[in-house]
Design a protein with these regions (language model features):
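Conserved ABC ATPase "signature" region
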Residues: 76-77, 127-147, 256-257
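ABC ATPase NBD coupling module
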Residues: 78-95, 121, 242-247, 278-284
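A short, proline-enriched helix->beta-strand linker immediately N-terminal to the Walker B motif
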Residues: 171-175
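P-loop NTP-binding/switch modules centered on Walker-like glycine-rich loops
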Residues: 178, 182, 186-268
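Conserved ABC transporter NBD signature motif
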Residues: 66-77
């Protein structure tokens, strides 16, 4: 794996609640290599959104980040970033595409106005900023971009709005693009188009992408590496080929077995994972997947660290390491 553009070490995040502290992220270590696409998968509640919010410095007021952790980006620990640091980083250096493009698009401003405003840190004249915006819209596949740039968001379909959101995110050529389930609201055809678009833009713009999705098929198609999260922990991290062909963690194997696309290919009933996520306010001792795991042994009662299982493949499971 290549050198990281973003490096997370010993990240622990909890939320204060009436039931106590909800330990949403625990001992997260993660590298996002330069010029790679890293996918994050896991059930709802596994910590994906909290991880993204922490990277972006957008945690809720009731969140607590434990001391001792760090998120290194561009020579700066983002956990210690000031308001001035975030003004320099958010958008120009780390950009985000959200699930709902209307989260990024202002309905009462034309696309041109919004895309020109994004470039406020550059000293170029407005005409040059508009030219760059039109060029980026054209690159993401907006037809008649020079004309349609003056329209408003409601004039575009859902797929076109997501393309515009991607164009806006990439306009300042960020080093890291965070795509938070950007295809969930789109149909299958548009999903495929957005995935193809992200792959081509990643090659052209020479940046990294952190891609969050529930769709394992999209992860397999788009990503170079995959991170599997469960109940606030990273339980497996591998190249996409190795993870899909030889998953090591029991949770990863069960998650892949639940993929409807795999069931359609191989036949047979759709599997489910019994039980549910543990209570983050009262986590069990040892492996947090133990109560749902079909392969549990006595050693699972102790907390397990991430261990190398193969080249570029780590897993948080003592049985997976010893037995493959």
């Amino acid at each position: 794996m290549s050198a990281p553009i973003l490096q997370i070490r010993c990240l622990n995040v909890a939320y204060r609640s009436r039931r106590g502290r909800l330990r949403a992220l625990r001992d997260v270590h993660l590298d996002i290599p330069a010029n790679r696409i890293v996918g994050i998968v896991g059930e709802s509640g596994c910590g994906k959104s909290t991880l993204i919010s922490t990277i972006l410095g957008l945690l809720a007021p009731n969140a607590e980040v434990a001391s001792g952790g760090s998120i290194q980006f561009d020579g700066l620990d983002l956990l210690k970033a000031t308001v001035a640091d975030w003004t320099r980083i958010r958008g120009p250096r780390i950009a985000t595409v959200f699930q709902d493009p209307m989260t990024s698009l202002n309905p009462v401003m034309s696309i041109a106005t919004q895309m020109i405003d994004i470039q406020y840190r550059t000293s170029e004249p407005a005409a040059e900023k508009r030219r760059r915006a039109v060029e980026m819209l054209d690159r993401v596949g907006i037809p008649d971009a020079a004309v349609r740039i003056d329209e408003y968001a409601h004039r575009f379909s859902g797929g076109m709005r997501q393309r515009i959101a991607i164009a806006m995110a990439l306009l300042m050529r960020p080093s890291l693009l965070i795509a938070d389930e950007p295809t969930t609201a789109l149909d299958v055809t548009l999903e495929a188009q957005i995935v193809h678009l992200l792959k081509s833009l990643k090659r052209e713009l020479d940046g990294s992408i952190l891609f969050v999705s529930h769709n394992l098929g999209l992860i397999a198609e788009l990503c170079d590496e995959v991170v599997v999260m469960y109940a606030g922990e990273v339980v497996e991290h591998a190249t996409v080929r190795d993870l899909f062909h030889r998953p090591r963690h029991p949770y990863t194997r069960l998650l892949l077995a639940c993929d409807p696309a795999r069931v359609a290919e191989g036949g047979g009933p759709l599997q489910t994972i019994p039980g549910g996520l543990p209570d983050l306010a009262a986590l069990p001792q040892g492996c947090v997947f133990r109560s749902r795991c079909p392969d549990g042994i006595d050693a699972c009662q102790a907390q397990q660290p991430m261990r190398p299982a193969a080249a570029d493949h780590e897993v948080r499971c003592v049985r997976a390491v010893h037995h493959g």
